[in-house]
Every structure is written in C-alpha cells, then in structure tokens.
Swiss-Prot record:
It is found in: Nucleus. The gene is Spi1. Pfam families: Ets (PF00178). Keywords: Activator, Developmental protein, DNA-binding, Nucleus, Phosphoprotein, RNA-binding, Transcription, Transcription regulation. Residues 171-254 bind DNA. Changing G41 to A/S: No effect on transcriptional activation of CSF1R or FCER1A promoter. Residues 124-164 are annotated as: Disordered. InterPro entries: Ets_dom, ETS_fam, WH-like_DNA-bd_sf, WH_DNA-bd_sf. SMART domains: ETS. This is Transcription factor PU.1. It comes from Rattus norvegicus. Binds DNA as a monomer. Can form homomers. Directly interacts with CEBPD/NF-IL6-beta; this interaction does not affect DNA-binding properties of each partner. Interacts with NONO/p54(nrb). Interacts with RUNX1/AML1. Interacts with GFI1; the interaction represses SPI1 transcriptional activity, hence blocks SPI1-induced macrophage differentiation of myeloid progenitor cells. Interacts with CEBPE. Interacts with IRF4/Pip and IRF8. Interacts with JUN. Interacts with RB1. Interacts with TBP. It comes from the Eukaryota. GO terms for biological process: anatomical structure regression; apoptotic process involved in blood vessel morphogenesis; cell differentiation; cellular response to ethanol; defense response to tumor cell; endothelial to hematopoietic transition; erythrocyte differentiation; follicular B cell differentiation.
Length: 271
C-alpha cells in the first residue's frame, strides 16, 4: 500500500509511532508532577526566596538614591494625569462651543422679528380702548375697593333708587348716595348741607355704617370701609360727577347728576 501511494504521486506522511506517543505522555506527566511538587512544597521557603531575590536587585540598582526620592516620583504622577485630562476636557469644550454661534444668531433674528407680528392688527378705537381699560381695572382691583368703572352706563331703575340689596343691575356710588339723601334713609349717616347746590356731608360717627351698607349693595364678601368709599368719591372728582368741598366730610354733586336724579325721582310711582 505504501508503494502504491508513492507511485501515484501523493505525499506520504508516516503515522506517529507508539514510541513517540509514549514519550510525549511521559514528558507531560513528568512536567505536571514537577509543577504540583512546587505548589505542594513549603510556601515559606519559596516566599523567602522571592523576597531575597527582589531585595537584592532593587537595592543594588537604586541604593545611590535617597528614600524620599521614590515618594516624590509616585506623588507627581497623578497630578500630571489630571492636568492631561483637564487639557483634553478644555479642548472638547472648545470644540463644543464653536457650533453654538449659529443658533444664537438665529434666535436674535427671531426676537427682532417679533414686533412685526403685531403690525397687521388694526389699532383699537379710543372708546373701545377706554372700555377695555375699565374692565381690566375691575378684574385687577381688590374686591373691596370701589373703582370708577363699576357702572354699566344705564339709567338706574326704580328698584335701585332706595339701595335695594340683591339687584342684578349695577349702581354707581354717587347715585347710591343721591338716592339715600332723597329718600331720607340713613339720615344719621348722611344729610344735605345745601340741597339746591347738591352739597352733602357724612357723619363722623356713623360713616362706617353707611360704607358697610354700600358694601352690601355691591355684593362684597368683606366689609366696606369709609376710606375706600371716599377714594371712589375722589375718583369721581376727575370725571365731574362729585367733587370734594373744603369742609370736612363734605362733597357736592354736579348739576348733571342732580338733573338725572330729579328725572328718576319723577319716575317713581306715588306711595
């Protein structure tokens, strides 16, 4: 068979002999035995031999250097690494900050464009703007404060002339006081000084009771004070319905208010 393989031209590799296999196994067993003999031996002897070898080589090479020299070399390495990391972080931050310029530029362009959005809207007329300001003032003002925009501009009906509580229609403060003066209600708190001129005066003792009555008329949850009611009367001085007289706690209605009040009084049914 061997000759036939040679004649056909195929390379021939002889199979391993039994002696070679036996030799390798014996070598492996011998090396394994030597390895375990080293492990199972006395560990102290090997440890002593190791430290003797290390001590011999270290002191022979570096015995000329002082001891503190090695400590300084070990303490210098970490700061050098930290400086390297910080330098790398600064470079990364510089690279990241560079592309942020275009978004800021576009943002400033958007802000500059914002006022143009309001231009197409038509401006409010003076009358409409004044009405919006009055409504906004009522929403922002405290609930107890009497504002000048509390009236709806309608002529008060007969049910409002005597300050009836719970009415759905609004009544202004000057009309409320005029109704009290003409009806004689709460005459201990307010009275005429000169009816023809429209001058009236509050009582220094009972003015708070009248203010409380006005708070109930408005539907306020908290108690109305004379100070807030007098503030509303001073606001009427700007529009002309009521003006302050130099005398203490004394005010005067305008002729227009007295005329409207006389017309409403004539509309009342006879008792």
């Amino acid at each position: 068979m061997l000759q036939a393989c040679k004649m056909e031209g195929f390379p021939l590799v002889a199979p391993p002999s039994d002696e070679l296999v036996t030799y390798e196994s014996e070598l492996y067993q011998r090396q394994t035995h030597d390895y375990y003999s080293l492990i199972g031996g006395d560990g102290d002897s090997h440890s002593d031999h190791y430290w003797d070898f290390s001590t011999h080589h270290v002191h022979s090479e570096f015995e000329s250097f002082p001891e503190n020299h090695f400590t300084e070399l070990q303490s210098v390495q970490p700061p050098q690494l930290q400086q390297l990391y910080r330098h790398m972080e600064l470079e990364q931050m510089h690279v990241l900050d560079t592309p942020m310029a275009p978004p800021h530029a576009s943002l400033s362009h958007q802000v500059s464009y914002m006022p143009r959005v309001c231009f197409p809207y038509p401006p409010l007329s003076p009358a409409h703007q004044q009405s919006s300001d009055e409504e906004e003032g009522e929403r922002q003002s405290p609930p107890l404060e009497v504002s000048d925009g509390e009236a709806d501009g309608l002529e008060p009906g007969p049910g409002l002339l005597h300050g009836e509580t719970g009415s759905k229609k609004k009544i202004r403060l000057y009309q409320f006081l005029l109704d009290l003066l003409r009806s004689g209600d709460m005459k201990d708190s307010i009275w005429w000084v000169d009816k023809d001129k429209g001058t009236f005066q509050f009582s220094s003792k009972h003015k708070e009771a009248l203010a409380h009555r006005w708070g109930i008329q408005k539907g306020n949850r908290k108690k109305m004070t004379y100070q807030k009611m007098a503030r509303a009367l001073r606001n009427y001085g700007k529009t002309g319905e009521v003006k302050k007289v130099k005398k203490k706690l004394t005010y005067q209605f305008s002729g227009e208010v007295l005329g409207r009040g006389g017309l409403a009084e004539r509309r009342l049914p006879p008792h």
